[in-house]
Amino acid sequence: MGCDGRVSELLRRNLQPTLTYWSVFFSFGLCIAFLGPTLLDLRCQTHSSLPQISWVFFSQQLCLLLGSALGGVFKRTLAQSLWALFTSTLVISLVFAVIPFCHDVKVLASVIALAGLAMGCIDTVANMQLVRIYQKDSAFFLQVLHFFVGLGALLSPLIADPFLSEANCFPANNTANATSRSHGSRVLSQHHAAAQPWINQTIPRLPPKEVTENHVSYAFWIMALINLPVPLAVLFLLSKERLLTCAQRKPLLLSADELALETRPAEKEDTSSLAPKFQPHSGQEDLFSCCQRKNFRGAPCSFFAIHITAALVLFMTDGMMGAYSAFVYSYAVEKPLSIGHKSAGYLPSLFWGFITLGRFISIPVSSRMRPATMVFINVVGVVVTFLMLLIFSYNVIFLFVGTASLGLFLSSTFPSMLAYTEDILQYKGCATTVLVTGAGIGEMVLQMLVGLIFQAQGSYSFLVCGVIFGCLAFIFYILLLFFHRIHPELSSVLTQDKALGVENPECYQR
């Protein structure tokens, strides 16, 4: 009860900034889940093949990674953080509004890349602001933060579903030339008196444009409007902190940073919260600053191994989450399942719905179960679910059941891993950036890889990839447990020294 009372008091003192950071991740969730169910409509809009449209996923995840790495530049002060969040959330609304006007896959990839930069900035800055405020009590608030990601990702496919086209303007899983020729013949037979052969990427633009403007465009514009209150909330927080005027910014930044430290209770066992005062840059470095050699002086080998294996686990799990959300719709509408487009459109919503449910469940569970145990259950559950999906690959009902199960197990992996590594290494910004970057690389690479394999080998390879990635995640997690066991317990010594006002220059930064 004492712990719960302390957390409640921390939340009461920081209610508005906490709610703002949670709402910012709602924008992140909206933007991360809309591509999957709208994939075929965007293919029609841009007249592209599956490998070509996969570059849109790649551009989003690549720029999300770059945004995550560069987000450290904007988290040095409260003003920079809030202005970065305001700009990023506003950009997401603008991207939603512009997507219907992108009729070339390269233009669409560029616009989605801009959204990826905004998402990456949100990912790093919002995570770090919550860790900065709540520090050792941040696990609970990180779970809620990622619950809002799931909430936005659940809403996005639900908004898109009524506007999805029931007809597929591309035949499933053919070569690019055959696809283009068949599509051109069918479209011309509907809209023109005669047909003519078409080479790759020379399909007439009018029919797909009409379909997109009359249907999917409305979904994107609705999402743009739904997202608008989020940048307004950030702007209101800027106003409350009196950071809207340049003249008042500098003195009030110190006040805001001191307020974040004052929210920590004065108990003796929590003196580790004073660490930022003794290491002023450790919680405020970007990815490039983290890689400097001086930050690792005196670090044991297990320190690097824990970073690498934890990042690899998130590489696999976040990559699987992104790939499954992106391609489960395309998998369902192809043989052998051949589910109708409207019914298949519910699969991404179901997936993100159970991710949201799992993150909601993990909020109270995280206060009673160790993060390491939660990650173990999640990874094992993912492997078992993919194996069952592979065994019952011809069963439509089990595809829906497996999708729900997969969302449940993947839901809390990222925040639990973040909390677990914090327990091991006393994470403060630098290591958080490493984990966020690893997860971003996974989403970028695995989505692109699955798209290429899906096109080359057929729909069955989609589940085979899931089994392989799940097994690799389990192997990397076992290695993480091993390196945790052999890692020297330096954190307690460092905490005691700092409680006495003594700095140890030989200790590595965390």
UniProtKB/Swiss-Prot annotation:
GO terms for cellular component: membrane. Its main location: membrane. The keyword Metal-binding does not apply. Keywords: Membrane, Transmembrane, Transmembrane helix, Transport. GO terms for molecular function: transmembrane transporter activity. The chain crosses the membrane at residues 19-39, 53-73, 82-102, 107-127, 139-159, 218-238, 303-323, 345-365, 380-400, 401-421, 434-454, 462-482. It is found in: Membrane. It is a multi-pass membrane protein. It comes from the Eukaryota. The keyword Ion transport does not apply. InterPro entries: MFS, MFS_trans_sf. Belongs to the major facilitator superfamily. This is Major facilitator superfamily domain-containing protein 4A.
